[in-house]
Amino acid sequence: GGAEKAAAMQSIMLTKLGYQVHIVLISNIIVFNYKGIIYNLGELKDKNNTFIGKIKRTFLFRKYLKDNKFDAIIDNRLRSNGLLNEIGICKYVYRNFKVLYVVHSASYKEEILKSTYLKKWLLSKAFKIITVSEGLRVFLKQFYNNNTLVCIENAVEVEAINYVTNQPFEIPYKYILFCGRFDEKCKNIKLLINAYSNSKIYNTGVKLLLLGEGDDREMYEELVANLNIAKYVEFKPFTINPYVYMKHAIATVLTSFYEGFPLVLVESLACGTPVIAINCETGPSEIIVNNVNGLLLETYNEDELSFALQKITNEKDTLNKFKANAVESIQKFNFTSISEKWKNILENH
C-alpha cells in the first residue's frame, strides 16, 4: 500500500543522505525497493501469532531498539491495531526514544474523533508527528501541539519512473486508468464505473482500465456486467510497475472518499499523464491545479465526473495543455526536495 511504498522510499532517501537505516517489518512482506538492514518480526508473526507470540515480539522489538541505540525512530505503521498493541509499542517499546510518527491516511481523523483522549495520550511523547499533507496537519492541530506537527509529503523519483516506463507495453487501445486498492469504503470506485458508463466515451474507443487488487473486485465486475459495459472495462492485477500503465493512459482518475496524500496522482503526473480527482478533504487540492495539470471536481456527482471524462477525452488541446504542465507541476514533491525536509527535521530540531 501507500504507507509501505512511502516507508521504502524514506529508507532510500535517508540512506543517500548518509544515515544508517534499519527497517523493522511487522508483516513478512517485502514488495518495494528499499535500502537498509531488515529486522523481520513478520517471520515470527507467521510462526506464532497467538497472544503469547505478540508479547514475545513486543519484547524482542524493544530489545532490538535498545541494542542498536537508535538516534531516531520513524513509525510508518497505520496504527489500526488493538489498544493493547498500541500501548505496548507507543508506551513500552518506544520509551525514551526519539519517535517520529507518520500519519499516512485521513482515516486517522475518524479514528481520533472516536477516541480523542486516547490518541493524544498514546502519542503524547512524540518528538514529531509527520503528516503527509498540509490538510492533515491543519486538522490535527486541534489535538496535538502545533510545534510537534510537521508536513512532509511523500516523494516521487521522476528519473526512476521515467526509466521503468520505457519497458515494452502492448495495450492496443486508449484508456482511462484507476490504479489502487479495490476497497469501496475508501476508493469509491463504483462512482467511477457509473460515470464512465454514463459518459459513453467507450463509443470513441476509450476503455476503463482498473489496475489493482482487493476484496471488492467481484462487486465491481458484477456492476460492470449489469451496466452492459463488460467489453469496455478491463481488470488488471497489482504490479510493481504501474507507471507504464500511467504513461500510456489518457488520464488517471481518483474518486476516493478520503486520502492522506494520494501518491498515485503525483506518480501519474510524473509520467506526464493528467489526472482527474474529486477533492476529498486532504490531498488532491495540494497536487492538482484545476485546468492546469488536470481536473479537480468539488462534488461526488456522477454527471460532473462523466463530463470531466468526456472533456479530457474529446478536447485534444485541453489534454495536451495538461500533459505539458504535468511533470513541472509536481517538482515540489521530487526526491531532493523531500529529502531536505527529512534532513531538516532530523538534524535541526
Predicted segments, located by residue:
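A conserved mid-protein helix/loop that constitutes part of the nucleotide-sugar donor-binding site
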Residues: 4-9, 183-198, 208, 215-221, ...
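Conserved acidic donor-binding segment of nucleotide-sugar-dependent glycosyltransferases
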Residues: 279, 289-291, 295-302, 311-316, ...
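Active-site donor-binding acidic/aromatic loop of nucleotide-activated sugar
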Residues: 216-219, 230-239, 245, 295-296
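Short His-centered aromatic/hydrophobic patch
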Residues: 75-85, 103
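Conserved donor-binding/catalytic core segment of Leloir-type glycosyltransferases
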Residues: 168-187, 193-196, 323
